[in-house]
């Protein structure tokens, strides 16, 4: 499988990725963000039935680069997106 190239910005939309790609994708994305000096990001997982959100939050709880996360405010996606603070001292 070819590596997926994604631009490193403060927002990532997971709609275009397969669920099985999400854990490795987020790990690589967070690492790239820290290396680029981006410490606050928004992960868009969508609202739907909340299955992907639960998976994302599970991943965030276990990731050493993540220091905090919460639902985005309504103007930034509400419960269809998660705001993530990354560790600046890695």
What are these regions (language model features)?
Residues 1-90:
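Long, charged, low-complexity intrinsically disordered regions
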């Amino acid at each position: 499988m070819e590596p997926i190239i994604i631009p490193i910005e403060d927002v990532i939309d997971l709609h275009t990725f397969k669920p099985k790609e999400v854990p490795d994708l987020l790990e690589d994305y967070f690492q790239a963000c820290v290396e680029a000096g981006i410490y606050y990001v928004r992960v868009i997982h969508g609202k739907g039935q909340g299955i992907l959100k639960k998976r994302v939050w599970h991943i965030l709880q276990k990731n050493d680069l993540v220091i905090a996360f919460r639902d985005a405010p309504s103007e930034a996606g509400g419960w269809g997106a998660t705001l993530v603070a990354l560790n600046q001292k890695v």
